[in-house]
Amino acid sequence: GQEALSKAGVDSNPAVRYIDLEGRTVVPGFNDNHVHALILGDHRSVPSLAGLDAEKIVYAVTKHYPAPKPGELLLAYEWDYPACPNPHRKILDDAFPDNPVVLVQFSGHGVWVNTKTLEAMGIDQSAPADSASSAGNHTAPEDPLVRDEEGNATGIIRDSSSNSLLMEHFKKVHRNPALARERLETALREFRERGITSFQDNTWFFPAILGYRRLKRHGRLTARVSCWLFGNDPKRSALMNLPLYGGNLLTRGPWKFILDGSFSAHTGWLCEPYANDPGNYGRGVPASHIEGYLEFLLKKNRQGAFHAIGDRAVKEFLDAAEKVAGKNPRLKDFRLRIEHAQLIRKEDIKRIRDLNILVAAQPSALATPDKDRE
C-alpha cells in the first residue's frame, strides 16, 4: 500500500495523480483476441434482431426503415434459429415487397433475404433443373441457396460472402472515410465501456487502416489495435502490407485465412455429415491450398490465424501443418492460431500441442450452443 509507494518514491513525484475509487475494484484492461470492429460499428447502426421471432423481426425492420425509398437496401443483423426457426423469403416479401432485404444471421456466415434481393443478385428463386440434388430444405455443398422440398429458394443464403448486395454495402462503408470512421468510433466506444484496451481486429480492408490512422492522428484511437490482413485475397492484403503502422497503438497482426464456414449455416467442415442434413459435410479448402498458405507465411515470416470451426477443418489444417513443419521445423515457432475451433477430434488435441499452435476459442460459442443447429 502506502509504504510500497513511499519506498518507490511515487508519493513524492509531483506528476503523480491520486484518485480515490471509494472501494471500487481496478483491473487491467482486457484484450479481445478476435473482433470485427468496423462491422461491429455497422451492427450498431441498424436494428439488432437477436432473440426476436419472425413477427418481431418484421416490426423491428419496419420501425427502423419507416419510409424507405423504392430499391433501398434494408439491412439488419443477428437473427438466430432458436427464436426464428423457420425463416422464409415470403415473410419478407409480404412485409417489404418493394425493397431488397438482407438480414444477417448471428454467426455472420448466413443471410435471410427476400425475393427482391434474389432478383437484384440475378438469382432465379424457382427450382433449378437439378433441384433434386438440393431439395429438402437443404442445399448441395456447392449451392449457397437453401431450398425447399420442391427445390425453390427459401431465402436463406448459407454464405454471406455469396450475397453481392451485402458485400457492396461493406464496400460502400469502407469507401466513405467519414462513415468508416464513425463505425470504428462506435466500436471503440463499446470497447471502452467494457474495459477492452487492446484487440485483434479482422481489419481486412485497406481503407479501415486509413480510418485507424486518422483516429490515431487526432488522438481518438482509444485502444491498441492489431490489424489482421486477409490472406485469402492476396491482392487486397498487398495494400495492407504497406508501411502504414507504427508505434504501439496500431500494429500489423497475423494474416487471416478462412478454411470453412459455420455450424448454423451448415458450412462448418465436418468429418461426419450434419445429423439433419444428410450428405452435407460442410465446405472446406483443399489441402494443397492450406499447405500453400503455410509456405507463404514462412516466406513472409509472419504469424497466421486460420478460421476453422469444424473438426474436419481443424484436422486438415493440422495435417498440412505437420507436412510443412516436417520440411521446415521453423513453422512451430510461428505461434499459428486456430480461430474458433468449436469441434475438435480428441486425437487432434495432442497434435495441436506438438505443433505449438494456439487455439483462439470464443466464449460465446459455449454460452449459446443452441444457436448452432445439428
Placement of each model-derived feature along the sequence:
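Divalent metal-binding segments
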Residues: Q2-A238, F257, S262-A313, G326, ...
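N-terminal active-site wall of soluble small-molecule enzyme domains
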Residues: E322, G326, R345
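Active-site-adjacent C-terminal substructures of enzyme catalytic domains
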Residues: L343-E374
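Non-cysteine beta-strand/loop elements that form the S-adenosyl-L-methionine
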Residues: H36, L249-T267, N356-L366
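Feature representing long, continuous alpha-helical segments
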Residues: S288-G292, K315, D319, L336, ...
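Histidine/acidic-residue-rich catalytic or RNA/ligand-binding cores of hydrolases
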Residues: T115, I209-R213, V314-K323, K350, ...
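Phosphate/diphosphate-binding loops
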Residues: R220-W255, R335-Q342, K346, D372-E374
